[in-house]
Amino acid sequence: MALTQVHNKFKIFTGALAADKTIGPLAEQISAFVAERKVAAKSIGVEYLESAKKLIITLGYSEGGDTYPVKVSTVSLGKIGGLETGDVSRLEEAMTGACASIQGIICHELYITDDGDFLVVFMSRA
């Protein structure tokens, strides 16, 4: 199945964090782009630029194949802490719990705000 994720096109979305620290309206912009352009969404990348207080989200996609609607969701994991020791089990558990209510996950990306909140972005089939 990994071959179905192959892509060579990218679209960049940028904006401020929403008040709740999620990607806010950028989620709908991504879904709308996929629907309007009739592309197959394959991957997302998320980077939070603390100094600029801006998000940069990259959408990897392909053209000319099967298309499908997508939904982009952000789930707050809160402050995880304790990662200095290298034990990431709490983060893994939080991410696993966060995806329990989301069906058809295509990919995910984790970001951390400047005040230490962990959030995960899921792209799933709508």
What are these regions (language model features)?
Residues 1-126:
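Terminus-proximal functional modules
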